[in-house]
Amino acid sequence: MKGKRAFMSKSLFIAEKPSVAQEFAKALKVNTSRKDGYLESENTIITWCVGHLVTMSYPEAYDPALKRWSLQTLPFLPKEFKYQVIDGVSKQFSIVSRLLNRPDIDTIYICTDSGREGEYIYRLVDQMAGVKGKTRKRVWIDSQTEEEILRGIREAKDWSEYDNLAASAYLRAKEDYLMGINFSRLLTLKYGPTISAFLKADRTVLSVGRVM
């Protein structure tokens, strides 16, 4: 029975983008068939994100009234942060989520870019997909050569080894979010009308950071 289970189990490799997934397929030298959003062979599946698949929710996800910009609702400081799948990539998220939770997948190799942002991209997907009971290993490579990819897979560590990196990624994202949401709204509400009058524009939005 154990032998049968081992034969049936598969490893899932998840890259940050399709081009990198193709490099992993070449390095692994597996005979894959092309599926919708992933490659599959007898014992290996290779899939990919397309950059970020999940993002932090805007204030109106917490309360519809917060969609309207008002000084009375600032600062916006949620006790718990909400996340959502990005609309334009929801199809790929659904594919990846289904693969992550497939019963025949026992080991997940995290092959997103080796760095804080790559770690964050996968962690958000894992969080939203609600992955449970899988072995997760982090592939950390310096290039996408065949030799380096195979070394990274061979030396892959348990993903918990990168928990501190993930924590720093979450923290930075929350800081960017709070700065952007609060200061963009504050400055726009206070100075936007004056600037609009000077520029003879209908409306002026003052953007701070990457989130508004």
How should these model regions be labeled?
Residues 15, 177-211:
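Prokaryote-biased recognition of long, low-complexity C-terminal linker/tail segments
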Residues 1-187:
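Intrinsically disordered, low-complexity regulatory segments
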